Regions:
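Short strand-turn motif at the edge of the Rossmann-like AdoMet-binding core
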Residues: 61-63, 87-88, 112-113, 141, ...
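Adenylate-forming AMP-binding core of the ANL superfamily, especially NRPS adenylation
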Residues: 1-44, 85-86, 131-191
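Short loop/turn motifs at secondary-structure junctions
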Residues: 105, 129-132
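Short gly/Ser/Thr-rich phosphate-binding loop of adenylate-forming enzymes
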Residues: 91-98, 113-126, 135-159
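Conserved AMP-binding/adenylation subdomain of ANL enzymes
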Residues: 30-59, 66-107, 176
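A general structural signal for stabilizing positions within well-ordered secondary structure
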Residues: 7-10, 49, 98-100, 127, ...
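Active-site catalytic pocket residues across diverse enzymes, especially alpha/beta-hydrolases
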Residues: 50, 81, 122-126, 155, ...
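Short, Asp-centered acidic motifs that coordinate Mg2+ and/or phosphate
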Residues: 57, 107-108, 135, 159
Length: 191
């Protein structure tokens, strides 16, 4: 079995990287051609701004047909960190998902509020606390004060960051780091 290594061609930041689709909220879903530059820019900002490192353990919980999957795959790979991918049967079982997060020492989670509620329910069922969690990056829907408070109980060390972005603006165009000591009656999308 011979191995032949060939040189890869250089990638221009303006070249298309992937195609993703809008939700179709204004009618038919539209295909969006995303270039390399915004994703690379986001990943560089994300890893540096939040001090993400090769020692972190990332979860890949995004659906494979949803554009956050690019963030969930390429962020950890860009810094040499581990990416943990649960079985689908684990993702839909709150107790199994809580056990999986704890067992794998997950430190970075990107999640939607409904997924957060699933994790919180599983943690409650298991009596689990996630001391290894460093960051919870929220997006995709409004983060309620009640869910924020419930997640503070099960992940007391985690920094909570609310992301906002659209399909047309890859990954996040605004963010807000939630201050646990502030009045968080309404958690902003960010700026």
């Amino acid at each position: 079995f011979a191995f032949h290594q060939s040189a890869l061609s250089e990638v221009d930041p303006a070249h298309p990287a992937y195609i993703t689709f809008t939700s179709g909220s204004t009618g038919e879903p539209k295909g969006i051609v995303a270039t390399h530059a915004p994703l690379v820019h986001f990943i560089e900002w994300h890893t540096q701004h939040h001090s993400l490192s090769k020692d972190d353990c990332f979860s890949l919980l995004s659906g494979l047909g949803h554009d956050p999957v690019y963030r969930d795959v390429f962020t950890p790979l860009s810094i040499g960190a581990k990416v943990f991918i649960p079985a689908q049967s684990t993702v839909i079982d709150p107790a199994a998902l809580a056990r999986w997060i704890h067992k794998n020492g997950i430190s970075i989670v990107h999640l939607t509020p409904p997924l957060g509620k699933l994790i919180e329910t599983g943690a409650k069922l298991q009596g689990a606390r996630f001391s290894a969690l460093r960051y919870l990056f929220w997006g995709g829907d409004a983060l309620s004060l009640s869910l924020y408070e419930q997640m503070r109980v099960i992940a007391p060390n985690a920094v909570r960051v609310n992301f906002y972005g659209t399909t047309e603006t890859p990954q996040a165009m605004a963010y807000h780091r939630v201050d646990p000591d502030a009045d968080n009656a309404r958690i902003p999308l960010g700026r």
